[in-house]
Amino acid sequence: MSLEHEKDPGWQYLKRSREQQLADQSRPYDSKKNVWIPDAEEGYIEGVIKGPGPKADTVIVTAGGKDVTLKKDIVQEVNPPKFEKTEDMSNLTFLNDASVLWNLRSRYAAMLIYTYSGLFCVVINPYKRLPIYTDSVARMFMGKRRTEMPPHLFAVSDQAYRYMLQDHENQSMLITGESGAGKTENTKKVICYFATVGASQKAALKEGEKEVTLEDQIVQTNPVLEAFGNAKTVRNNNSSRFGKFIRIHFNKHGTLASCDIEHYLLEKSRVIRQAPGERCYHIFYQIYSDFKPQLRDELLLNHPISNYWFVAQAELLIDGIDDTEEFQLTDEAFDVLKFSPTEKMDCYRLMSAHMHMGNMKFKQRPREEQAEPDGQDEAERACNMYGIDVDQFLKALVSPRVKVGTEWVSKGQNVDQVHWAIGAMAKGLYARVFHWLVKKCNLTLDQKGIDRDYFIGVLDIAGFEIFDFNSFEQLWINFVNEKLQQFFNHHMFVLEQEEYAREGIQWTFIDFGLDLQACIELIEKPLGIISMLDEECIVPKATDMTLAQKLTDQHLGKHPNFEKPKPPKGKQGEAHFAMRHYAGTVRYNVLNWLEKNKDPLNDTVVSVMKASKKNDLLVEIWQDYTTQEEAAAAAKAGGGRKGGKSGSFMTVSMMYRESLNKLMTMLHKTHPHFIRCIIPNEKKQSGMIDAALVLNQLTCNGVLEGIRICRKGFPNRTQHPDFVQRYAILAAKEAKSSDDMKTCAGAILQALINQKQLNDEQFRIGHTKVFFKAGVVAHIEDLRDDKLNQIITGFQSAIRWYTATADAGARRKQLNSYIILQRNIRSWCVLRTWDWFLLFGKLRPQLKCGKMAEEMIKMAEEQKVLEAEAKKAESARKSQEEAYAKLSAERSKLLEALELTQGGSAAIEEKLTRLNSARQEVEKSLNDANDRLSEHEEKNADLEKQRRKAQQEVENLKKSIEAVDGNLAKSLEEKAAKENQIHSLQDEMNSQDETIGKINKEKKLLEENNRQLVDDLQAEEAKQAQANRLRGKLEQTLDEMEEAVEREKRIRAETEKSKRKVEGELKGAQETIDELSAIKLETDASLKKKEADIHALGVRIEDEQALANRLTRQSKENAQRIIEIEDELEHERQSRSKADRARAELQRELDELNERLDEQNKQLEIQQDNNKKKDSEIIKFRRDLDEKNMANEDQMAMIRRKNNDQISALTNTLDALQKSKAKIEKEKGVLQKELDDINAQVDQETKSRVEQERLAKQYEIQVAELQQKVDEQSRQIGEYTSTKGRLSNDNSDLARQVEELEIHLATINRAKTAFSSQLVEAKKAAEDELHERQEFHAACKNLEHELDQCHELLEEQINGKDDIQRQLSRINSEISQWKARYEGEGLVGSEELEELKRKQMNRVMDLQEALSAAQNKVISLEKAKGKLLAETEDARSDVDRHLTVIASLEKKQRAFDKIVDDWKRKVDDIQKEIDATTRDSRNTSTEVFKLRSSMDNLSEQIETLRRENKIFSQEIRDINEQITQGGRTYQEVHKSVRRLEQEKDELQHALDEAEAALEAEESKVLRLQIEVQQIRSEIEKRIQEKEEEFENTRKNHQRALESIQASLETEAKSKAELARAKKKLETDINQLEIALDHANKANVDAQKNLKKLFDQVKELQGQVDDEQRRREEIRENYLAAEKRLAIALSESEDLAHRIEASDKHKKQLEIEQAELKSSNTELIGNNAALSAMKRKVENEVQIARNELDEYLNELKASEERARKAAADADRLAEEVRQEQEHAVHVDRQRKSLELNAKELQAKIDDAERAMIQFGAKALAKVEDRVRSLEAELHSEQRRHQESIKGYTKQERRARELQFQVEEDKKAFDRLQENVEKLQQKIRVQKRQIEEAEEVATQNLSKFRQIQLALENAEERAEVAENSLVRMRGQVVRSATNK
């Protein structure tokens, strides 16, 4: 990075310094021992493997000073220090959770908050302000590639912006994360960056404007959306409670055009409810702030804010946020966004009304289920803000209007319902205001007059959520993230596939996007969670629990992602099911899901609000809402059609799913970029990482999922030169085996394979890179470290050997010196006393002076020699300096070229490396030489020493020079090679004149070929036109695009192979083409490419365009052009330093052009050779056209784009070649010099012919240019010919596609026809069903008529029973009571029930009075006429049986009426459903016809485009003809080409729009087809269900008719039996009178037993009733019944003993009665005994009476509970239906019980008659009956327990067993009637007991008065008969009233 960047204060937070990197990478590391181990607090900590563990799969790890034994699969590898704080985690050689966490932790500690992870950019919230978002930082990232700058949000944003401009593709940025992670802040920074970039592009056009700009408006949307959509949460003070997708539109030049916003998943519940520690939306607190004090008065906010319940449930203030300042920003943003003052005020008024509405109070009216307002102050304030009438508003809340049948009535609401309605209205109103705000912002940001060509979308949405309590909102948020993760996986898979395909890697691709498909289908597919939730919302009586049960039954054990939730732990809430997402298993609770999904509103309140006169905004936001009354009125006005809210019932899930589908469709059409925001800790503390929290977010955000995908492929990759440079040490010989880096890389890897260090599966070699599996790079790094250790060890040992050897040599020299010194010293000691030596010492100085001259001469000679050597060294130094200067210049040129091409090639970098090393060596050598020369000059006096030293230095210098010479030789060779290339180019330019002659000869042949090719091209274009016409048909079958993509990829790969093969073959044809034309063409192409780059960069476009214009003018005026070229060349020579970079680039491009020229020349030669075979090839093409009919539309579209790209490339090549022609001519220095020489010679020969000569030269140049143009046109013809061949192949494919897609279209048409026929059949079926319903109605009427007849028969039978009217009236009164009770359970209304209750009470009072009178009279009657009473009892039993039959028939009649009514209602519902289905079918047909008409319009548009294309083709043919004629000039061709390009672009744009429109229409057609299919299947399913129900109904009705017929027959028989019974009564009444006394005595004892039996039966009946009402209490009731039964049994035993005693006394009384006159004394004794027994019996009777009173009280309480249970009738009916499985079995048992009851009644009658003579036997029979009743009670209990057990198994069969329940009820009623008969008998027995008591006390004293008593009894009998007559009349009147 540049020094300027490093000076920025924010740079330290973006990238580490070099020193920090070295420090991080220098830590010790051992890949085999350093590991990560799990830690509870830190997540993972680093440890060192100490050794193997006690088991084979364990190791001992030392971490934190402790040894831990762990399993091997738990520990994770540590990455080498090279990857410490790496900027892209996908480069990690060990991709594991611990390494990812450590990398993020270490970078976050250094405040490097941005980190790449493959396609992700992970950002961690720093919890403090960092200077990394300033304008200076933004300018750093503008125009830079992602790899050039450190990770940053701006880098990703700029990449998206550049991709949009370069690839002409829409972009999207997906910013996700949990609340508080920084999504909103990053979104704002992204928007500001795009606004800055777009504005910078626009500034040049609109400089100096003062008005509000679009950039300002885009930025100002944030305060508005944050005020209404953000709130304080526990984690975040400014949390966005909604998701948004912001699309920023640009034009083709990158200028900001407009912006629009879409929002998702607004948290509506926050406006009425806030959790502790949280706050409502900011706007409520802002309007209450002090920014506009008068605003509070205007909004009637007179109370403290803490008094407003809706906004004051938790926090009121936020630390660090000033609501006054924020409100100022919000209000100013409203102004910037062009909100009018009225709109602002209306919006504030609605917010104030919301606060007032939360304080409205209501109370419950006494004794009514109706709420009423508790004060109207707050309601008046709210209505004042709404602009509506307060009375209407309150009435709409407490009494909304609902539709019942066909009428509208007011429904009373209780307090809870009113409060719930207020909350629902508050949520709905706020959501609509927020939607209006977004809509208004979009209207403001929609700028007119600027093209909206592309957009960049920014998605800010909540990330995955796994809470302790997960509800409806979490399901949808997680579903959205599931879809986004699938989108990312698929996108990453596509990029990996493209990368591997581009590099030629063979790999089996895995679409990881399919991994999440199962979970997504579980949620959104039919019978999925959302589908079943929507279904439950329309099912009557559905609850959240039924939804949970259905989900469990449908998916548990059947779907892998649906699980049973585990029990809650800790703070976890209850869950009903669990689902496995990619981020983990989530436990969901379904409470309130139905209400949240339906989100109902009070239509009456909405109608009141829509009528507001003072608040226009309120009217506007409710304008699109249609209430039920409005829909009914509209339907009535439109012909009786029914409708609901907006014509259909839309649940929240439906709306969410629709918006989500739109979002995913939009994202799939863009190039995505991913930003993942992370919360580091819950404490909001900067610099601290909570490992568990971060790992959970990485999982939820999909970062770890992305790493998992990386592991499956080859995540690590390295460029070939980099790989060779770094790992050449592993195979030095192989690294130098070739100049091709790819070959060297392959050789190195092969050497490692031979060494058994790697295998073939661990890597792949691509065209430019080497790809490695995860962990392989670390292994190779270890091998490199080992190799370096070996080399360094060997090097150190060699140095040690050298130093030791040198030391030994020095020591030997020292030893020799010592020896010499010692020898000389010894010699001196010997000579010092020698006389001759002394003489020598005296003469020696004189001899030395004499020889000084000789020494000086010698030294002078040596000096000369040294000076000569020094001069040589100096000259060598200068030559080295010159070489150094040359190398420096060459280096600067190469560096400039390298900088210009932005990266250069690996070969140039290697050359630069070698040149730099050579330069350094040369510099070092020069410095050494300079030092040595200076030393020679300074130390000239000591030449002897300097000479030795100089010699040594010269030797060293020679060695250095030799090394430098070697390097220079290499550099000179390379330079010579480049110069040779330049010379060859110049030679080629010199050979132009020679080639022109050859071209003239070939011109005619080429022209002939050209004409032939033009004809062929026209034929092919005709085929192309045919293909275009067929394209309109092909565009109707776009649904096969995905399969076509795969085939296209394979074909594309084959095409690329064939293309490379053809390109290799074309290289041999280079020598047959004009070299200058080819160079010109290729140079023009390179210049065109350069112009595109300059256009993208926007820096040098004006200079290049001026240069192009100058060159165009020079082509027209050749002489002036030559002069200008000379001036420009001179200028170029003067500014050579500035043009070196461009020249180097042109030189490189020229080399590339030469290669491409070779290829195209070979292509032309092959094309010319193939022209002779053109006819046969055309035949082959036609045959191929027939063979390739099965291709699809997607392939056609891609081929079309490819053709367009090729045409565009050819056009661009033409322009570029024409422009580069001028530059090439500037390089023709030799020609220009020759031209100068010729002009000079002409001037010297004759000045008069200068002008003529110049003109002649000009003509020659024009001829040459024309010839060049001809050559160029010839080349273009060749290219067009080759293009034509390719187009022929493409057209063949297109034709094959046409035929295939026509077949598919025919299939679709047939399918459509089938669908139409199915619709017709469905309509016919509906009509048939309607006809069947009409028949059913007729049958129902017949049944009703039959029932009326039954009623008449019943009335006749009732009227015919005058003789038994007393019993009949009693039974009818009981029937009326049970009927009232039955109706009170839900079949009649409360008012009718009260009316019936009053009537029944009156009847009961009358009956009680009559009963009292009758009892008083019957007492005396029974004394005298016992016989009559006995016969009456017999007749009563017969009447009871017949009345039971009559009651059964009446109940059957009522049940049948109810069944008929139910089926009528069902038939009406079915008719409604069929009508709705018919309407839907009509609507679908209408939409299909509309789509067909739109498709026809599109076809017409396509036909128009085809005609335009044909015109375009005709123009191309005209241009080709003009080219062959050579008559156009360069400027005309240039203009034509540009015009054609523009037309082509317009045509292509029109075609793209048409294709897009057609795709949209096709998708609509497909959706409609799916909907039609669903509707058809649903209709068939419903028809099948209704047919089954109708069949069951017919069967049940048939059974009912048979039962009624049988009942009628039985009733006729009963009537005959009654007549016979009447006669029998008349004959038997006298006999019964005689046996009265004995019966009374026997009945005294029997009554006791019967009373106990009555108590037991009554207990059983009470238990049955309680079981029906409260199933949960049945066990307790039965336990109580068992206790009472035990008591009854004990009492029964006591009574048995007492009866035995009384039997004895009775026998004695009989004997005494026979001998009454003779044994009076004995009777008195017996009378005393009877008196004692009487007292006992009286006590027992008193006890029984008390018990009877208790039971009567219980009966009254039961009746009270029955009245209260009227509201629970529906639930009881539901519970009854659940008992239907055993209904048949219970019916049989109860029939048998009924039979037993009848038998019991007969036995009782027999016992009554037999008691006269056989009292003891009667008592025994009573005991037997008691035992049988006990057994029946136990059996009934067991059967009821079995019914309870079968309850849970029979819910699903409730509907099927509906009619069986009715039969069960009837049987139960019969049983109840039997119980009532027993009760009546007990009453009679009670009276008989009283009479028996009187007889027992007075039988002796009043024996003589019997005759008088009989007379009195006769009188009372007459009175009783009159009473019976009166009672019979009452019964008749009551029956008539019924």
UniProtKB/Swiss-Prot annotation:
<dbReference type="Pfam" id="PF00063">
    <property type="entry name" value="Myosin_head"/>
</dbReference>
<keyword id="KW-0518">Myosin</keyword>
<comment type="similarity">
    <text>Belongs to the TRAFAC class myosin-kinesin ATPase superfamily. Myosin family.</text>
</comment>
<dbReference type="GO" id="GO:0051015">
    <property type="term" value="F:actin filament binding"/>
</dbReference>
<dbReference type="InterPro" id="IPR008989">
    <property type="entry name" value="Myosin_S1_N"/>
</dbReference>
<keyword id="KW-0067">ATP-binding</keyword>
<dbReference type="GO" id="GO:0016460">
    <property type="term" value="C:myosin II complex"/>
</dbReference>
<dbReference type="Pfam" id="PF02736">
    <property type="entry name" value="Myosin_N"/>
</dbReference>
<dbReference type="GO" id="GO:0000146">
    <property type="term" value="F:microfilament motor activity"/>
</dbReference>
<keyword id="KW-0505">Motor protein</keyword>
<feature type="region of interest" description="Alpha-helical tailpiece (short S2)">
    <location>
        <begin position="846"/>
        <end position="1170"/>
    </location>
</feature>
<keyword id="KW-0009">Actin-binding</keyword>
<feature type="region of interest" description="Disordered">
    <location>
        <begin position="1"/>
        <end position="27"/>
    </location>
</feature>
<keyword id="KW-0175">Coiled coil</keyword>
<feature type="compositionally biased region" description="Basic and acidic residues">
    <location>
        <begin position="920"/>
        <end position="951"/>
    </location>
</feature>
<dbReference type="Pfam" id="PF01576">
    <property type="entry name" value="Myosin_tail_1"/>
</dbReference>
<feature type="coiled-coil region">
    <location>
        <begin position="846"/>
        <end position="1938"/>
    </location>
</feature>
<dbReference type="GO" id="GO:0006936">
    <property type="term" value="P:muscle contraction"/>
</dbReference>
<keyword id="KW-0787">Thick filament</keyword>
<comment type="function">
    <text>Muscle contraction.</text>
</comment>
<feature type="compositionally biased region" description="Basic and acidic residues">
    <location>
        <begin position="16"/>
        <end position="27"/>
    </location>
</feature>
<feature type="region of interest" description="Disordered">
    <location>
        <begin position="919"/>
        <end position="951"/>
    </location>
</feature>
<dbReference type="GO" id="GO:0045214">
    <property type="term" value="P:sarcomere organization"/>
</dbReference>
<feature type="region of interest" description="Rodlike tail (S2 and LMM domains)">
    <location>
        <begin position="846"/>
        <end position="1938"/>
    </location>
</feature>
<dbReference type="GO" id="GO:0005863">
    <property type="term" value="C:striated muscle myosin thick filament"/>
</dbReference>
<dbReference type="GO" id="GO:0008307">
    <property type="term" value="F:structural constituent of muscle"/>
</dbReference>
<feature type="region of interest" description="Actin-binding">
    <location>
        <begin position="660"/>
        <end position="682"/>
    </location>
</feature>
<dbReference type="InterPro" id="IPR036961">
    <property type="entry name" value="Kinesin_motor_dom_sf"/>
</dbReference>
<dbReference type="GO" id="GO:0043050">
    <property type="term" value="P:nematode pharyngeal pumping"/>
</dbReference>
<comment type="subunit">
    <text>Muscle myosin is a hexameric protein that consists of 2 heavy chain subunits (MHC), 2 alkali light chain subunits (MLC) and 2 regulatory light chain subunits (MLC-2). Interacts with itr-1 (via c-terminal coiled coil domain).</text>
</comment>
<feature type="modified residue" description="N6,N6,N6-trimethyllysine">
    <location>
        <position position="128"/>
    </location>
</feature>
<keyword id="KW-0963">Cytoplasm</keyword>
<dbReference type="InterPro" id="IPR027417">
    <property type="entry name" value="P-loop_NTPase"/>
</dbReference>
<feature type="region of interest" description="Actin-binding">
    <location>
        <begin position="764"/>
        <end position="778"/>
    </location>
</feature>
<dbReference type="InterPro" id="IPR004009">
    <property type="entry name" value="Myosin_N"/>
</dbReference>
<keyword id="KW-0514">Muscle protein</keyword>
<dbReference type="InterPro" id="IPR001609">
    <property type="entry name" value="Myosin_head_motor_dom-like"/>
</dbReference>
<feature type="region of interest" description="Light meromyosin (LMM)">
    <location>
        <begin position="1171"/>
        <end position="1938"/>
    </location>
</feature>
<dbReference type="InterPro" id="IPR002928">
    <property type="entry name" value="Myosin_tail"/>
</dbReference>
<dbReference type="GO" id="GO:0005737">
    <property type="term" value="C:cytoplasm"/>
</dbReference>
<feature type="domain" description="Myosin motor">
    <location>
        <begin position="84"/>
        <end position="785"/>
    </location>
</feature>
<feature type="domain" description="Myosin N-terminal SH3-like">
    <location>
        <begin position="30"/>
        <end position="80"/>
    </location>
</feature>
